[in-house]
A protein has these predicted regions:
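Conserved phosphate-binding catalytic cores of ATP/NTP-utilizing and phosphoryl-transfer enzymes
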Residues: 96-104
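Active-site nucleophile and cofactor-binding loops and adjacent substrate-binding regions
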Residues: 85-95
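Conserved "HGTGT" condensation-loop signature of ketosynthase/thiolase-family condensing enzymes
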Residues: 1-87, 104-111, 115-211
Length: 211
């Protein structure tokens, strides 16, 4: 019996990555790095027209250069005219949040194709700064509208946590681990084995990544 898939099932159809380590290579600004990663993702998908037909362009907030609307800068480079342009606030979890929300939008029928990207050129900025140079990267006029913002800027630590010195990841993550272990009903040894198996699989995949 063939398995029937939900026609609105969200699927990641392609991924792309670019990393420039060679100092002799012409440096790319963040928007172009993001666009090139998307081009590679489209190639990885085996399809065509995904980028130009994107309903949403979502970008992770970049730190190495400031665009008034990073999502628009990327959309222009990939030839997309999306209904939605959005950029995250700064935060290590926002890329995952955007993937989850994109999946929800596709499941709900609010979009067909959503592209998510991020890119930094911090090493290039640092190298130019040491040489006393400023990058000649693109800028956007003040008339460009800001993108929709994804995420919020709530303090990472609340008053109760501050009062108890629970401020750094090394303090917080163990609490998550204990709570997760309790929820799953695992012993300490069983939890360690489960986590070890999980990260071993991650490591196996990472070992095949040329970047």
């Amino acid at each position: 019996m063939a398995l029937e898939l939900d026609p609105r099932l969200p699927i990641i159809v392609g991924t792309g990555q670019i990393m420039i380590r060679d100092a002799a290579t012409e440096p790319l600004e963040p928007a172009e790095l993001m666009a090139e990663a998307l081009r590679r993702a489209e190639t990885d998908s085996g399809g065509t027209g995904l980028l130009t037909g994107a309903d949403q362009v979502l970008t992770v907030r970049e730190l190495s250069w400031r665009y008034r609307n990073p999502a628009l800068a990327v959309a222009e480079r990939i030839g997309a005219t999306p209904r939605r342009l959005a950029t995250s606030v700064v935060g290590g979890n926002l890329a995952g949040v955007m993937v989850a929300r994109a999946a929800a939008d596709i499941q709900a029928g609010a979009a067909e194709v959503i592209v998510i990207t991020g890119g930094e050129a911090t090493r290039t900025r640092s190298r130019l700064r040491k040489a006393g140079l400023e990058p000649e990267w693109s800028t956007q006029s003040d008339s460009v509208e800001s993108p929709e913002s994804i995420g919020d800027l709530r303090p990472l630590v609340n008053e109760m946590e501050n009062a108890r010195g629970v401020q750094l990841p090394v303090h917080v993550y163990p609490l998550f681990e204990v709570a997760l272990r309790a929820r799953l009903g695992l012993s300490v040894e069983g939890h360690i084995e489960r986590i070890g198996s999980l990260w071993s699989a991650f490591s196996e995949v990472a070992s095949t990544n040329p970047n």
